[in-house]
Amino acid sequence: MEPIPFINHSWSYQGIDGAASSEELRQARVVLQNELQELLSASLSPIEWYQTVNELHDRIYRKAVELCIQGMVEEGFGQPPVPYAFIVFGSSGREEATLWSDQDNGMIISDNPHEGKEEYFAQLGGRMADMLEELGYAKCEGKVMCSEPLWRKTLESWKEQLRSWRSDLAWEPVRNLIIASDMRFVAGEKGLADEWIAAFYDGFRAVPELSDAVLRNTVKHKATLNILGQVVTERFGEHAGGFDVKYGLYIPLVNSARFLALQHGIKETSTLKRIQRLVSLEAVPLTLLDAAGRAFMIALKFRRSTPVVIRGGLQQSSGFLDEKQMKQKQMHYELRDTLGQVRRVHRALQRQLRFAERRRP
């Protein structure tokens, strides 16, 4: 696979950097989003497009943190009493968020003693979730947000939480560990995030059974090709005749690359970077990684091709290719071929799981 280029386009983020309120920040997001989607999409590769979109999100997150703290200072709460880190998970953690992605975030708070720090950061976390919602980032249905105590903790409490999840290999704790594995630092004190990452990977290596537990989670996803090799579309509802790009194509590849990365101690969060590191380590057959990498590039393209609607000046998408798109021969052929590559990767992981299950006492 070709190395991922670093793109630094020259348009101005002045509207974000100079925003003095959530209203101004939302308007800056609308302006830059429209410029990105309408003027630049045709000239940017999928990788360039996602890099630029995620740089936009990161700048908005950092400004939102600044505005929330400014509001707390003005209301008498003061500056943060101890260092903290604002972190993201999900597609933002993997730097694969679309223009319409929702919230997936958390917070790490320093262990430095201060009597009022829990109350302060509970207030800040709640304000952040509310402001991001005002800015067009829907609140996470799974409540993975810094407003929730489960995802807003002191560093030591985070370490205890990670230990707790590692000690219980049931579906929910393993799912939370999988979510946590995509963590990426955005704002605040980076050293807290670095220490969190070290604790996560040290702990993961210390529990060999975790790898199989993650694999069991990884191989579960919706069927996308029938026994004749035809694409399985939605049969009923508003998306009838359409195809679920997120859960039918994108997420299975994300999950596969994540599992292989965790198995081999790779700390990258970007799916493509995980695949590239696996290639460099020669940890997995090259033909399998090549299939996964090519399929993932198509998945990125299809994710940004799903129909969008404009609400309040901001784009929203269901994540489905619609029936009209599915009737386009070239798109349908490309999707079917890519899903064949996904099935190939999936079957390889299923074989690995069967082998692991046979080894269990």
Regions found by a protein language model. Give the residues of each.
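Hydrophobic packing residues in well-ordered alpha-helices of helical domains and bundles
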Residues: 25, 29, 50, 54, ...
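Generic, well-ordered alpha-helical scaffold segments in large soluble proteins
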Residues: 60-67, 71, 127, 131-135, ...
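N-terminal regions immediately upstream of nucleotidyltransferase
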Residues: 1-72
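Conserved nucleotidyltransferase catalytic core and NTase-mimicking acidic/glycine-rich helix/loop elements
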Residues: 202-361
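Alpha-helix N-cap/helix-initiation motif
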Residues: 46, 50, 114-121, 245
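Active-site nucleotide-donor binding segment shared across nucleotidyl transfer reactions
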Residues: 57, 61-117, 122-124, 129
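Core structural elements
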Residues: 26-29, 83, 90-93, 217-229
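Conserved NTP/Mg2+-binding pocket subregion across the NTase superfamily
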Residues: 123-248, 252
